[in-house]
Structures are given as structure tokens and as C-alpha cells.
Amino acid sequence: MSSNLLQVDFPRLKSDVEALAAIGRADDQGIYRMAFSEGDMQARSWLQERIVQAGLELYQDGAANLFGRLAWDPDKPSVMVGSHIDTVPGAGHLDGALGVLCGLEALRSMKEQGISLKRPLELVAFSDEEGRFSGMFGSQALCGDISPQWIHAARDLSGMGLTEAMAAQGLDATEALSAARSPESLHAFVELHIEQGPVLDELGSSIGVVEGICGLKRWDVRLTGVANHAGTTPMLMRSDAFQGLAEFSVEIDRILEEHGGPQSVATIGRVELQPGAANVVPGEARFALEFRDLEASVLYDLSDAFRRTLSAIARRRGLMFDFKVVSELVPVSCDQRIRQLIESTAQSFAYNH
């Protein structure tokens, strides 16, 4: 690229952010654009229009990932920027969208200002990056990390299948197998993202240069006891599944301290009790356990510690314990060269980081 400093149109970028935020916004001001829902499809149509208006080459692959290409040459490795525009229920308006829209503005401004490029640029909005169907469908498809079995097994929390949801929007989920890109086709990938935590704010820093992507394990855990009348079953004679869950939740901090690292986190984000009546001892507690770290060895140690702790609690309380691995992603270190480039650029603009 030439040394000319890129000038972006911030009012235009702000207008795009506000326009996208209006799609799928509910009365509670949260945004509901779950993958392949009506809100998501409306947002995708809006983005396609903006890509075309920007003079970029519009492309959609078999996994329904959307691309806007500048100076496209299939024989040259490209620099890819972007994120996603699908959301979790009740999302904020910048999660994912900021990376896509800032990427759009950058490519649009480069084209308008006639900046010469050494290699092609691609804007991408990945499909189902928020994991409605367990995983990160669009980016995993691009990496060749899905199979026909995965596609047909993928379901959301309501039981709807990925193939069914995509078919309702005129899309064929099995076409995602054609979306795989070779590593040689990409020179670099850069994503701008809001911080989804308090660290930068607490430090008073404007920018965080990401060192790596945490690995993740997500389990569907079930503790099974005996449902009995809450008024007539003595405490010492109960096999209370919720008490087992409660004891395990208290143990999480200890397990992280003893077996985790400085960046380890673990969360119980969903709990279901059966039969779910106020006057019945819970006979089943089912919950989602998710834990993350930057080191694969730490994730292994945490897995072992969580499993052993749950087994011990179950034995002590007269419960049965089983779990299913719902999702598993390996940790990845970010490229040192790109990190240094982002850091030096931040320093040149006097951004504390």
C-alpha cells in the first residue's frame, strides 16, 4: 500500500452502525438477530446492498459467509478483515457489527481514494459466529473444519436443526462443505472487536492487542437423583440433584485456583431442574459448563479436575453423573508479526494499549 494516510468518513460509519443496529432491535433495546432468523436475513440483505454501493465485489460462499472484495485476484493471497452481524438474544449493537462495518468503511475509503494495494482485500461477515447451532459455523466452514455429520447433527436449544433453519431461508447447509479455503489463499486476517469485559476500562486503555484466542470446552452436564416430596422427605434421606449442582458451583473457584492459569475462566450459564416444582426435591439437574484458557494443557487439567469433582460429589450425595461434550475449540496464538504491526500503529497514533 502507498504511504498516504487513509481518510475515513466517520459520519458515514456512524450512520451505518445506527442503521444496522435498528435491524432486529426489540422493545427492551436489545438486538435479536440470531443466525438465519428473519432479523439476521434482513441484516444480511442490508449489508449486501452496502457492499455493492461501496463498489466492492459481492460474494457469498456455500456457508452463507458474505464477502466484499477489493482488487480481487484469486491467484494472490488476500488480507481479510471482518467479523459477524448475527447476535445472541438481546445483544448490544457493536458486538461483531463494529468489526464488519469498520472493515467496510476502510475498504470503501481505500477504493474512493484510489489507494494502491499490494494484495487483494476481503471484507467478511461470518454466518452463525455466535453459535446458535453449537460452534462457529461460517468460520469453521471456511477453515474446512466441518463434516456432513456435523452439519446434520447441529441443532439450536429449541431443537431446530441447522439444515432446517437454512432451508427455510432458501439455503442449503450441505453447500458449506464447498466453503473451505486453503491457508495459502490468505495472507492475514484482522478483526476489530469491542472488549466484552471490564479490563481495558479498568486500566484506562484505549486498545488491547490480542495475544491469542482462548480454547473452549462446553459440556452439557446432568446430575440425576430421586424426585421426592419436599415436605415429607428428611434431608438426610434425599438424593437432591440441585444440592449436587450447588456444591459443584462453589468448587469452581477452588478448581480454577489449583488447576487453572491466570486467564482461566469457567461459567455455569444455564440450569434446568426437573420436575421443577416448589414442593418437589429436584430429581435431575442439568446445566451447561463452559471453561476457557489460552493453554491446551490447562484445559486438559481443568477437564480432569471438573470430572473428578463432579464424580466425587455424585457419589457422596447418591447421584448419577454424566456429561456430553457439546463444543470444543483449541486455543490459538495470534501471529506475532501482525501483533507488532498493530502495536506500532497504535503507538504512532498515541493510543494507550
Q: What spans do the regions from the language model cover?
A:
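Flexible, glycine/charged-enriched surface loops at secondary-structure junctions
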Residues: 61, 116-117, 176-180, 254-268, ...
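A non-catalytic alpha/beta surface segment that caps or lines the substrate-entry region
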Residues: 25-71
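An extended, acidic, His-containing surface patch that forms the Zn2+-binding/catalytic region
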Residues: 324-353
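Midchain, well-structured core segments that form catalytic/ion-binding scaffolds
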Residues: 128-297
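A generic, well-ordered mixed alpha/beta core segment in the N-terminal half of proteins
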Residues: 87-158
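N-terminal capping segment at the start of a domain
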Residues: 2-37, 325
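Glycine/charged-rich beta-loop-alpha catalytic/anionic-binding loops adjacent to active sites
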Residues: 28, 77-90, 224-230, 349
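Catalytic-core environment of secreted peptidases
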Residues: 54, 66-98, 103
